[in-house]
Amino acid sequence: PIGMAAGFDKNADVYNSLFKLGFGFVEVGTVTPLKQYGNPKPRVFRLVEDEALINRLGFNNLGAKNIVDRIKQNNPIGLLGVNIGPNKDTTNRIGDYVENLKAFHNIADYITINISSPNTEDLRNFHDQKKLNELLKIINNEKKNLKSIVPIVVKVSPDIDDREINKICEVLLNNDIEAIIISNTSDSTRDRLKNIQGHQRGGLSGKPIQDKS
């Protein structure tokens, strides 16, 4: 099936319309425990000559409670995933993932742990083998406490080498993670971009990262 990735329907507004268009699954979010505006505008840049986009949205969303209410009021007619992440100003990022798991475990068909957005400072530190293992063990323990069987998926960055990929896959397998999403946007060098906006800070997507992703 072809699905709609997180980032399009951030606030669970149109997932059923997307199902009616023929998408096999839809992933809403990224959702944080508390509502947040994200980064100041402008924060999306279209690079026409490069067939690319740069975004620095910064997890703008209405917060877990509001999005839970929306999903409960509009029963999904297809496979609905929820992509979760921490609030920008949180002092406990793992705790934020756990709070989101508690909120969505009984209404999502799967939950994606987003550790790969380049627009939340140091979020990609969770690509470290020890830190990722700690996060996933806590998530799995909370699943047991909740008596939940919701599948857990992890979304990774394209800016990792083969050695890192192997380590991450080992951690995912050891923690019974159901799937891996490849990939988020890239914060790699922009030297070859033609558009004058190519210098903008944020995650690069589109043709320039096709091979990398």
Locations of the language-model features?
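Non-catalytic positions within long, well-ordered alpha-helices that form the structural scaffold/packing
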Residues: 18-19, 104-105, 173
